[in-house]
C-alpha cells in the first residue's frame, strides 16, 4: 500500500519494466562469468555528449560546441534563458515574459525555451548530466504552417547556473544516441562533480535606465566522506529580480509609435499598438447596423452636435461611428515589462564508491520561481464587430439597464473595461535520480539509473470579468448596475463582475535506463573498437486544468444560443477544456565506434522506440566519420534520421476554440483590400475584412510522427599550435511537420472555390462558417462576380501533417589560446549562418499557392508556406565571441553577441516593401581581481553588460522591440564577491 501511495498504481502494475534493467545488471555478471568484486578499478563517467562510449576516439570528430564555466562567467548570465541567448546555434526564444500574445493560454512566469537551429520549440532535446529533463508544465502555441499549434519545451531556467561545469551542444542531432526526438540537436548541461570546498558568491546588479536592482546569492559546498569514498556536493542559487515598469522607458510606455516618428516612410500607418477600443466605446442598436452611437468624453466636439445625448461629467453619446474625438487606449501604461521574480535553484549530488568498486550516484534537484503580481492590459470581450450577431461574446446592454440613456438594447463594439487584470505565476520542479555504475573484469562497464521528475505551474489572474456576472450586472435596473458610460470619472460598479481565473499545469517524467559499454571490444587497424548497448523506458504525462469558467463547469450562453465549448464565461478568453495525457516509450539502442584506420574513425548508432499512444514505431540510425587527412586537417561528417512523435497536447487535446484577429480573403477581394462601407454613410462598415475570428481545432490520435534527416560535413583545421578553425555545412529536412492550414488560408481557399464556381457558388469552403449575408453587400459581391456572403464567424481546422520543412546552413568556429610573459590569452569566435529555411506547400496549401502564382488571387498572400529565412525572428546570422586575459591576480573577460537582421512580415506593404529589423550586437566586459580575506581566497568582479548601451531595434510589437530575439534593458552592471572558505 505504501508503494501505491508513493508511486501510484500504474507504476506498480508496470514494475517489471522498472526492475528489468537492474535484473540485466545481474544477468550481465553471469553472462560474462566474472567476479565483479575483484575489479577495484576507478569508475569513469561519460563526458562527451556526442557518444555514450567512454573514451571513444570518434568524439573529437563530432560537431559539438562547448561552453565552459569560464565562458559562462564571462557572459555574466543569471538564468538559463540568458545562457541560451549566448549560444550561436540557438534561435528565437518563444517562451519569454514580454510576449503575452497567448493570454491565459501562454506559458507565463519564469520560462525560457530551447530552440537549436531555429527549427522551433520542441525540436531540441535538453539533458542534464546526460539524461532528460521534464517538460515545462505550461505550454503555448507557435505559428507552424498557417496558424498556431501547441508546443512544449523544457524550461531553460531550470538549469542551476551556479553549479554548471559546462554546456555541450551536439549540433548534428543525436536521435540514435539519446532519443529519436532529438531532431535539431542536443543541449546537455553538465554540472560540477567531485567538488571540494565551500564557496559563497554574492552579486548586485543595477541598470543605467531603470531604478530596479537584481540580487543573487550562490553557495557551493562539497566534501569527501568515508575516507574519500563518498563525495557530497550542494549547489544553491537564490535570485531576486526587481520589476521594470513600461512607464520607465518612453518607447515601452506608449504603444503608439506612429505619431512619434516622422521618418517611417511607407510604414507611417504601422507601429500603432494602442487601441481604438477604450472606455469610450462604440455601440449599435441591437439587431441592426443602421443606428450607431459613439461615446465621447466631456468637452469633445461631437458633444456639441444636436443629436448628442448628454451624460453629464462622463461625456456624451452621439449618433456617429467616428473615432476622431474618442481617445485611443494606451495598452502599455503601467504594465510591467519585467515582473518581480524570486527564483531558487537547488541541486545535490552524492557519489559513493562501494567495496566492490562500483559506484552509487544520486542527484536531487529543485527549482521554484514566483513572479508577479503583474498588471495586464485593459480587456474587452471576444468578437468586437459592427455585426453584433457575429460576436462570440456579445455584450448587450439592455434597455432596462439603469444607465442606458436610450430606449433600446445596445450592442457594444469598440469598448474596453476600465480595470487591469493582475497576473501571478508560481513554478516548481523537482528531480530525483538514483543510479549505479561499475565495471566487469573483461572490459565491460555498466550503468543504470532511475529518474523521477515532476513540474507544476499555477497562474492566477485577478480582476477578470465573468461573463455570467457581467450579464447580471448589465440587467440590473438599480444604481448598482454596471455602468458602461462612466467615462472614467463616475463609478462603474465593475467590481461586481470580477473573478479570479486560474490555470494549473503538471508534467511528469519517469525514466529508467541501463547501458553496457566496452571501449576495447576488438582490435582494428586504427585501434580498439568500442560498443554500447542500452535499454530505456520512460513515461511522460501532462495535465492542463483550467478555471471552471473556461472549462465549461460554469458556462455562459451568448444572446443567440451559443455556449461552451465555443464560448467561455470569461471576457476576452477562449474556452479551454481540461486535458491530460500520457505516453510510454520503450527504447533499445546500440552504438559502435570503430577506428578502421589510424586516421579514420567511424560511428554507427541505431535506436528503436515503441510508443504506447501511436501505432507507429521508430527506428532511427546515425553514421558519422572522422578522417584525419593530415595532422592539421580533419574531415568529418554525419548522417542521421530522426522520428518525433506528436507532442501530448496535439494528441490528447479535445475541442479547443481560439479567437484571433484575422483577415478574410473573400472580403479583401470584394472590397479591393478595404472594409466594405455603406455608400450612403462612409462611417458605417458593412463588412469587416479584418476582425476577431474563432478557430476551432482538436487533437488527433491519427497524427503521424514527424520524420527527418540531418546531415553535416566539415573540416577541423589546426594550422598552428593552439589555433583551431572549424567549418561545418549542415541541413535538416523534416517531413510531416505538425501544423495547421490556418484561418487566413481557409478563407483564401473559400475565395478560390467561389471564384471557380462563379455567382452560383454560395457554399465555398465548408470549413468556413459565415453569418447570414447582409443584403446591403449584395451589389459589391455581384460586381466581383460572386455570391453574396456574410462575415466569418468560425473556422474549423484540425492538426495535420504538413509537407516538407527544410533548414540548412554553415557553422564557423575559431579558437585560439596563447601564453606570454604578459599573461595568458584566449579567444573563441562562433558564427552560425542559416542559408535556407522553407516550408513546402502540399494539399490545399499547394492549391492556393498555385492559384496565387497564376494571378487568380491578386493581393492575397498565402500564410506559412514559403521561404521562412530572414523572416519573423528567423535570422540568417548569429555570432558569439568570448575572450580573456589572465595575468597573476587579474583577469579581464570580454564577450559579444550579434543577432542578424530579419524582416517583420506583419507590416509588409502591399507593394512588397519590407520592414527590416537591423542586426544588434551587445558587448560585455568583466574585470576580476583575486585576493585574500583573512587567509581565505576571494575574488572581486565588476562587469559592464551591454557596454555601448545598445537598445533593441524598433519593431511593431507590444513594447516596440522583438522580444523573442532581442533584449532592451540597455547598459547594466554587476558587482560580485566570491569567497572560498
What are these regions (language model features)?
Residues 159, 194-197, 226-229, 355-358, ...:
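Short loop/turn motifs that connect adjacent beta-strands in outer-membrane beta-barrel proteins
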Residues 83, 125, 186-192, 199-206, ...:
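Predominantly transmembrane beta-strands of Gram-negative outer membrane beta-barrel pores used
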Residues 124, 128, 132-133, 148-203, ...:
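A beta-strand signature from Gram-negative outer-membrane beta-barrel systems
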Residues 2-88, 117, 156-159, 218, ...:
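N-terminal Sec signal peptide and the immediately downstream disordered periplasmic leader
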Residues 724, 735, 835-838, 895-907, ...:
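C-terminal beta-signal and adjacent terminal beta-strands/loops
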Residues 658, 823-932, 948:
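C-terminal beta-barrel architecture of Gram-negative outer-membrane proteins
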Amino acid at each position: 500500500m505504501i508503494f501505491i501511495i508513493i508511486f501510484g498504481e500504474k507504476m506498480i502494475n508496470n514494475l517489471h519494466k522498472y526492475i528489468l534493467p537492474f535484473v540485466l545488471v545481474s544477468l550481465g555478471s553471469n553472462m560474462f562469468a566474472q567476479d565483479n568484486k575483484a575489479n577495484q578499478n576507478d569508475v569513469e563517467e561519460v563526458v562527451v555528449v556526442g557518444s555514450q562510449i567512454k573514451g571513444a576516439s570518434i568524439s573529437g570528430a563530432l560537431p559539438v560546441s562547448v561552453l565552459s564555466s569560464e565562458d559562462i562567467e564571462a557572459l555574466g548570465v543569471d538564468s538559463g534563458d540568458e545562457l541560451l541567448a549566448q549560444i550561436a546555434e540557438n534561435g528565437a526564444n518563444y517562451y519569454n515574459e514580454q510576449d503575452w500574445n497567448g493570454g491565459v493560454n501562454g506559458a507565463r512566469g519564469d520560462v525560457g525555451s530551447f530552440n537549436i537551429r531555429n527549427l522551433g520549440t520542441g525540436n531540441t532535446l535538453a539533458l542534464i548530466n546526460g539524461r532528460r529533463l521534464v517538460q515545462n508544465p505550461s505550454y503555448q502555441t507557435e505559428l507552424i504552417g498557417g496558424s498556431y499549434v501547441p508546443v512544449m519545451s523544457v524550461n531553460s531556467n531550470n538549469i542551476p547556473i551556479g553549479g554548471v561545469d559546462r554546456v555541450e551542444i551536439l549540433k548534428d542531432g543525436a536521435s540514435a544516441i539519446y532519443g529519436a526526438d532529438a531532431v535539431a540537436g542536443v543541449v546537455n548541461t553538465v554540472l560540477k562533480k567531485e567538488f571540494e570546498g565551500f564557496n559563497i558568491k554574492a552579486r548586485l546588479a543595477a541598470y543605467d535606465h531603470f531604478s530596479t536592482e537584481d540580487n543573487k546569492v550562490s553557495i557551493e559546498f562539497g566534501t569527501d566522506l568515508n575516507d574519500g569514498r563518498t563525495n557530497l556536493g550542494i549547489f544553491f542559487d537564490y535570485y531576486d529580480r526587481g520589476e521594470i515598469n513600461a512607464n520607465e522607458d518612453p518607447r515601452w510606455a506608449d504603444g503608439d509609435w506612429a505619431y512619434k516618428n516622422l521618418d517611417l516612410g511607407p510604414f507611417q500607418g504601422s507601429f500603432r499598438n494602442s487601441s481604438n477600443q477604450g472606455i469610450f466605446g462604440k455601440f449599435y442598436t441591437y439587431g441592426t447596423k443602421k443606428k450607431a452611437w459613439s461615446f465621447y468624453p466631456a468637452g469633445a466636439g461631437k458633444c456639441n452636435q444636436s443629436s448628442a445625448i448628454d451624460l453629464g461629467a462622463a461625456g456624451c453619446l452621439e449618433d456617429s461611428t467616428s473615432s476622431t474625438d474618442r481617445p485611443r487606449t494606451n495598452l502599455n501604461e503601467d504594465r510591467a515589462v519585467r515582473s518581480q521574480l524570486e527564483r531558487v535553484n537547488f541541486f545535490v549530488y552524492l557519489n559513493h564508491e562501494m567495496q566492490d568498486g562500483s559506484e552509487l550516484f544520486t542527484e536531487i534537484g529543485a527549482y521554484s520561481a514566483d513572479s508577479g503580481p503583474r498588471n495586464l492590459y485593459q480587456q474587452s470581450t471576444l468578437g468586437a464587430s459592427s455585426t453584433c450577431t457575429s460576436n462570440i461574446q456579445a455584450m448587450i446592454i439592455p434597455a432596462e439597464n439603469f444607465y442606458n440613456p436610450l430606449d433600446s438594447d445596445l450592442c457594444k463594439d469598440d469598448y474596453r473595461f476600465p480595470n487591469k487584470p493582475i497576473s501571478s505565476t508560481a513554478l516548481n520542479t523537482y528531480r530525483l535520480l538514483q543510479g549505479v555504475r561499475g565495471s566487469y573484469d573483461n572490459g565491460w562497464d555498466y550503468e543504470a539509473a532511475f529518474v523521477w521528475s515532476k513540474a507544476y505551474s499555477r497562474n492566477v489572474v485577478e480582476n477578470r470579468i465573468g461573463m455570467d456576472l457581467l450579464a447580471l450586472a448589465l440587467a440590473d435596473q438599480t444604481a448598482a448596475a454596471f455602468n458602461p458610460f462612466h467615462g472614467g470619472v463616475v463609478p462603474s460598479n465593475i467590481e461586481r463582475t470580477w473573478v479570479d481565473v486560474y490555470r494549473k499545469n503538471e508534467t511528469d517524467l519517469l525514466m529508467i535506463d541501463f547501458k553496457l559499454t566496452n571501449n576495447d571490444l576488438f582490435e582494428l587497424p586504427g585501434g580498439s573498437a568500442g560498443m554500447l548497448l542500452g535499454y530505456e523506458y520512460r513515461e511522460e504525462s501532462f495535465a492542463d486544468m483550467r478555471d471552471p469558467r473556461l472549462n465549461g463547469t460554469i458556462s455562459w450562453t451568448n444572446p443567440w444560443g451559443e455556449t461552451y465549448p465555443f464560448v467561455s464565461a470569461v471576457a476576452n478568453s477562449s474556452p479551454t477544456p481540461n486535458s491530460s495525457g500520457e505516453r510510454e516509450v520503450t527504447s533499445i539502442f546500440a552504438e559502435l565506434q570503430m577506428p578502421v584506420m589510424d586516421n579514420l574513425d567511424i560511428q554507427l548508432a541505431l535506436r528503436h522506440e515503441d510508443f504506447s499512444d501511436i501505432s507507429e514505431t521508430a527506428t532511427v540510425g546515425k553514421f558519422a566519420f572522422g578522417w584525419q587527412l593530415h595532422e592539421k586537417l580533419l574531415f568529418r561528417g554525419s548522417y542521421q534520421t530522426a522520428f518525433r512523435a506528436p507532442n501530448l497536447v496535439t494528441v490528447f487535446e479535445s475541442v479547443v476554440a481560439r479567437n484571433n484577429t484575422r483577415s478574410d480573403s473573400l472580403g479583401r477581394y470584394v472590397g479591393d483590400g478595404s472594409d466594405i462601407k455603406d455608400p450612403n454613410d462612409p462611417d458605417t462598415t458593412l463588412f469587416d475584412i479584418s476582425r476577431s475570428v474563432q478557430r476551432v481545432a482538436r487533437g488527433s490520435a491519427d497524427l503521424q510522427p514527424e520524420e527527418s534527416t540531418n546531415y553535416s560535413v566539415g573540416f577541423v583545421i589546426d594550422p598552428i599550435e593552439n589555433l583551431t578553425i572549424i567549418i561545418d555545412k549542415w541541413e535538416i529536412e523534416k517531413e510531416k511537420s505538425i501544423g495547421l492550414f490556418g484561418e487566413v488560408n481557409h478563407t483564401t481557399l473559400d475565395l478560390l472555390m467561389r471564384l471557380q464556381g462563379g455567382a452560383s457558388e454560395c457554399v465555398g469552403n465548408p470549413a468556413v462558417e459565415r453569418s447570414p449575408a447582409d443584403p446591403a453587400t449584395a451589389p459589391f459581391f455581384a460586381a466581383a462576380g460572386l455570391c453574396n456572403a456574410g462575415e466569418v464567424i468560425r473556422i474549423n481546422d484540425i492538426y495535420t501533417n504538413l509537407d516538407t520543412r527544410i533548414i540548412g546552413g554553415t557553422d564557423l568556429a575559431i579558437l585560439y589560446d596563447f601564453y606570454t610573459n604578459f599573461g595568458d590569452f584566449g579567444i573563441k569566435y562562433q558564427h552560425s549562418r542559416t542559408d535556407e529555411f522553407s516550408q513546402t506547400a502540399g494539399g490545399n496549401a499547394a492549391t492556393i499557392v498555385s492559384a496565387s502564382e497564376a494571378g487568380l488571387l491578386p493581393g492575397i498572400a498565402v500564410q506559412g508556406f514559403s521561404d521562412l529565412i530572414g523572416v519573423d525572428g528567423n535570422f540568417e546570422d548569429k555570432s558569439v565571441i568570448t575572450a580573456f586575459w589572465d595575468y597573476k591576480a587579474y583577469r579581464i573577460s570580454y564577450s559579444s553577441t550579434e543577432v542578424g537582421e530579419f524582416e517583420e512580415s506583419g507590416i509588409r506593404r502591399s507593394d512588397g516593401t519590407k520592414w527590416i529589423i537591423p542586426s544588434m550586437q551587445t558587448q560585455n566586459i568583466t574585470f576580476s581581481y583575486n585576493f585574500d580575506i583573512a587567509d581565505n581566497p576571494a575574488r572581486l568582479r565588476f562587469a559592464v553588460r551591454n557596454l555601448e548601451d545598445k537598445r533593441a531595434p524598433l519593431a511593431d510589437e507590444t513594447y516596440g522591440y522583438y522580444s523573442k530575439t532581442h533584449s532592451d534593458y540597455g547598459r547594466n552592471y554587476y558587482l560580485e564577491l566570491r569567497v572560498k572558505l
